[in-house]
Every structure is written in C-alpha cells, then in structure tokens.
Amino acid sequence: MLGEFKKFAMRGNVVDMAVGIVIGAAFGSIVKSLVDDVLMPPIGLLLGGVDFSDFFVVLKEGVKAAAPYQTLAEAKAAGAVTLNFGLFVNAIISFTIVAFALFMIVKAMNKLRADEEVKPVTTKKCPHCCSEIALEATRCPHCTSEL
C-alpha cells in the first residue's frame, strides 16, 4: 500500500498540482499586499482619506467599551461584533486580480498548446498536375492520372 501511495504521489500530475498550489498561495499573498498596500491607499486618498479596511458596521457593541469605534481595530479590541464590508471589498478586488491573472495564464497556455498541435496530413499533391488530393487516392480526380 505504501508503494502504491508513493507511485501515486510521484506521478507528474500530482507533483505539478502541488507546485501549482504552493505558487498560487504565494501569488495570492502578493496580490493581497498589492491591493492592501499599493492600490487601496491611493484610492482611499482620492476619496478623502478613506481606509476601506475600516469600513464596518457594528452589529453588537463590545463589553469593554461602547460605540462609536473609529477603527475596526478599536471595535475588535472592545469585543464588538462587526460586519466588515471594507475588508470584503478588498477581498473582491484581490480575487478579481487573481482571476484575471489566471485567465491570462490559461489563455497563453491554450495558445501555446494550440500552436503545438500538428494536424495530421490528409492530403498530398498529384505529381502530374500538382493539385491537392486525398492521401489515400489512387487516381487524381483533376487530371485522372494513376498514382
């Protein structure tokens, strides 16, 4: 049974999938940082100094301190129950970037794969009239020469 598992785990598809998952996780963290640290601060600045990660609604006030809370960190520190729609907006933007990047990668791979596919030869040229004829033909339909 251990030998079967080793054979399964060492197949090319499983190893490729594992590498893809690890690279995908790393790419996801890069995109998250891009959204949180690079894209959203200028957008927030253009919208009047808004920090999207601090967009939240208090569902239940905390036991340690009463509302209003200026930041999500204050609300969490007070033990408040919050609906964090600003973080959700950030997650949607991250997902969109990752999905678009994957779409572009898959599109490029499909183009490479289509270029690699060689169509089987189904025709040949008649040696007498140089017309395209079926590969299995024994007589040219254009000049009626025997092949």
Swiss-Prot record:
Location of this chain's protein in the cell: Cell inner membrane
Recorded topology in the membrane: Multi-pass membrane protein
Keyword Endoplasmic reticulum: no
GO cellular component, one term: plasma membrane
GO molecular function: mechanosensitive monoatomic ion channel activity
Stated family: Belongs to the MscL family.
UniProt-recorded name of the protein: Large-conductance mechanosensitive channel
Organism: Tolumonas auensis (strain DSM 9187 / NBRC 110442 / TA 4)
The encoding gene: mscL
